[in-house]
Amino acid sequence: MKHFNGKVLFLDRSNINTDEIIPAKYLTEISKEALKPCLLEDLQLEGFDPIRDIDGKSVIISRSNFGCGSSREHAPWALEVNGINLVIGESFARIFRQNMFNCGMMAVELSPETIENLFVSFAEKDTLIETDLEKQRFIFKAGREKKQVPFEISEFDRQLVKAGGWVEFADSKY
C-alpha cells in the first residue's frame, strides 16, 4: 500500500486539467521517472513555482473538478513519481478519479465548506497530514493547530488502495 501522509501542497484553483498536471508533449514517455520533472510545469497559478513548491510534498489539496480534460493515466503517474499519492478536492473528473484508484492512489472529495476551511486554516502554513484509511479520517497538523476531517470512499476503492491498484487487486483475486 502506498503512503498517504506527509506535507501538503495547496493549489487554490478549480479546473486544473490533465494538460496542466502533465503536458501532452510528454505523453510519449513510457517511463514514469521521465515524467517527474514535468509535473504541473504548465499550471497557471499566481505565485506557484513547480520546482520550488512540489519537492517534498505528498498530498495536494485543490478546489473543484481536478483532473478534468483528457483521460490519461499519465496524470496519476506524474503525481506518483513525485511522491504525491493523495489529492483532496471538492470534486474530480470521473476518469481521473478512477485512474487514481486504479493506480492505488486516492482522490478524495470533501465538501466545498470543508475545503474552504482547510485553505483558511492551513494553506499559509507548513501543514502535515496523516491518513487513517481504516477509520476514514485525515488529521491535519500545523504547529499547534490540529484538525480531524472524516472522509468516505467506497469499500471497493479502499480495497484497490490497500492492494496497490487495480492490477494488484485483480492478481490477488483471480
How should these model regions be labeled?
Residues M1-F4, K32, E124, R144:
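A generic structural signal for short, non-catalytic loop/turn and secondary-structure boundary residues
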Residues M1-Y26, E168-K173:
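N-terminal, positively charged, Ser/Thr/Ala/Gly-biased leader segments
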Residues D12, N17-T18, I22-P23, S31, ...:
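Glycine-rich, flexible loop/turn motifs
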Residues I16, G67-E73, V161-A170:
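Conserved phosphate/anionic-ligand binding catalytic regions in large, soluble enzymes, centered on
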Residues T28-K135:
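Feature captures the catalytic cores and cofactor-binding loops of soluble hydro-lyases/lyases
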Residues G104-Y174:
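Acidic, glycine-rich flexible loop/linker segments
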